């Protein structure tokens, strides 16, 4: 009996931890050669380390747009697992700026009141906790339905193209408004947040690079930049260093569905600055 209780507790803790993971598409280098094999890695954990694989049956959409080509969907069987990373090999095309995207199915996690507080702190959603205090819901357990939607912008050769701004139609999506591979240190990158295809104002977007990220002792996120979207759903961030960059955000709303109390949509986009 004690062993069953312990196993159930471990499974519960694992679900809570996994729902707190950020998801990123990483490449060893986002600068690729034309007509060659390239490899992407799904990091399910932090920007530096993948702590769990992403099961292939959770991949609702996998999209690849090579420069100047139509959107294709690599088969789930093309993926394999390696060191807690989910890995995909693909072939690049001609020179230009390409896009990779992964969208997951939804999953419901059950939280105790205490574990939900930790989860919200981890995601930087403190307003949700304040609202729960005001509505006297702070001591109630929570069912959160979550999904993750991530992209990577990669550069093939030296010639840039307009493919970087392709909208994949995910429930939540970060879309660059200027090409990251046109930028140098000191330039500004504009990013638009779309939720169900519409610009979302007043949403917090985090951005950072390399190893400049983490969490404080209270669990709150520590990213290099923290910016609210304007009325057009846009944030602007000054590029301060070369390296691998990300923008990320989480949208959480009260659910009208019977199987969840909240709906969580998270988005991230990755790219590289070399100039």
Predicted regions and their residues:
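Bacterial Sec-dependent N-terminal signal peptides
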Residues: 1-22
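Start-of-domain marker
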Residues: 20-83, 88
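Beta-strand-rich domain onsets/edges
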Residues: 21-38, 119, 123-189, 194-203, ...
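Short acidic/polar inter-strand loop motif in beta-rich domains
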Residues: 49, 105-113, 253-259
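Short amphipathic beta-strand segments in non-cytosolic proteins
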Residues: 63-71, 204-226
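Glycine-centered loop-to-beta-strand initiation motif
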Residues: 84-86, 221-243
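Short, aromatic- and glycine-rich surface loops/edge beta-strands on solvent-exposed regions
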Residues: 96-108, 244-254
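A cross-kingdom marker for long, charged
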Residues: 234-275
């Amino acid at each position: 009996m004690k062993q069953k209780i312990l196993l159930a507790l471990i499974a519960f803790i694992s679900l809570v931890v996994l729902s707190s993971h950020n998801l990123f598409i990483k490449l060893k280098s986002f600068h690729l050669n034309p007509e060659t094999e390239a490899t992407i890695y799904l990091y399910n954990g932090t920007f530096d380390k993948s702590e769990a694989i992403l099961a292939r049956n959770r991949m609702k959409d996998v999209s690849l747009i090579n420069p100047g080509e139509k959107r294709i969907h690599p088969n789930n069987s093309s993926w394999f697992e390696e060191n807690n990373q989910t890995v995909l090999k693909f072939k690049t095309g001609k020179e230009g700026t390409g896009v990779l995207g992964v969208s997951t199915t939804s999953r419901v996690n059950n939280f105790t009141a205490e574990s939900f507080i930790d989860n919200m702190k981890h995601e930087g959603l403190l307003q949700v906790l304040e609202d729960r205090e005001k509505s006297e819901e702070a001591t109630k357990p929570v069912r959160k339905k979550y999904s993750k939607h991530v992209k990577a912008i990669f550069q093939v050769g030296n010639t840039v193209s307009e493919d970087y701004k392709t909208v994949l139609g995910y429930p939540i999506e970060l879309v660059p408004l200027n090409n990251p591979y046109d930028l140098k240190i000191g330039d500004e990158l504009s990013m638009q947040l779309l939720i169900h295809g519409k610009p979302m104002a007043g949403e917090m977007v985090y951005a950072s690079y390399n190893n400049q990220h983490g969490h404080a002792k209270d669990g709150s996120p520590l990213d290099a930049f923290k910016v609210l979207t304007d009325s057009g759903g846009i944030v602007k961030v000054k590029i301060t260093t070369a390296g691998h960059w990300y923008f990320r955000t989480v949208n959480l709303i009260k659910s009208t569905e019977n199987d969840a109390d909240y709906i969580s949509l998270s988005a991230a986009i990755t790219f590289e600055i070399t100039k």
